[in-house]
């Protein structure tokens, strides 16, 4: 997949999300505005955005929404589809999929063959990092989103660095700058 194409697509997603936010009047204090595109052969086949309920404790991350919408559209197909996932944040900072989203993706491996996960990362020259899904799935220290950290803090005390070293069973129990320089996005 052409690297410049991915960078352009991420810029388009960022602008699209900013337009949605502006039209809705939504004000975010956390810069947590993400968009996701599910790609088949480099072509977007499903989109998702982060959704937060202001009156309750319901969130749906962009990755989960895009995959859910794709599952709904495909219905009960038995054919396994090869896909890549692109996740971007409107402010261009890190958008690595969290533990809950990785677990959700893993639960769908019977329907999808997820190859690469592309996400915005400030430390990459191109602004995008590419990681094989299998590597992301097997990481010992997965990212935990702010919402889940707050739930853990509420019910299990203050999450500190030792939280990340908890057993995988505990971790799995958690409910499931846009001006980029053109350079190569390499998968780790």
Locate predicted features.
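Zinc-dependent deaminase catalytic domain
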Residues: 1-188
């Amino acid at each position: 997949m052409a690297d410049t194409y991915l960078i352009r697509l991420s810029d388009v997603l960022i602008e699209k999300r900013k337009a949605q936010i502006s039209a809705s009047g939504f004000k975010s204090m956390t810069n947590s505005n993400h968009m996701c595109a599910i790609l088949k052969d480099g072509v977007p086949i499903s989109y998702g955005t982060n959704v937060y309920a202001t009156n309750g404790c319901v969130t749906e991350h962009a990755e989960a929404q895009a995959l859910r919408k794709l599952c709904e559209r495909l219905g009960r197909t038995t054919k396994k589809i090869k896909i890549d996932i692109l996740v971007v944040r409107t402010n261009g900072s890190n958008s690595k999929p969290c533990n809950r989203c990785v677990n959700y993706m893993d639960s769908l491996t019977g329907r999808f063959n997820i190859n690469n996960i592309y996400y915005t990362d400030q430390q990459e020259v191109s602004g995008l990092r590419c990681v094989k899904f299998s590597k992301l799935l097997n990481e010992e220290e997965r990212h935990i989103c702010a919402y889940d950290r707050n739930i853990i803090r509420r019910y299990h005390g203050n999450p500190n660095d030792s939280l990340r070293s908890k057993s995988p069973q505990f971790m799995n129990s958690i409910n499931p700058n846009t001006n980029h320089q053109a350079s190569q996005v390499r998968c780790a």
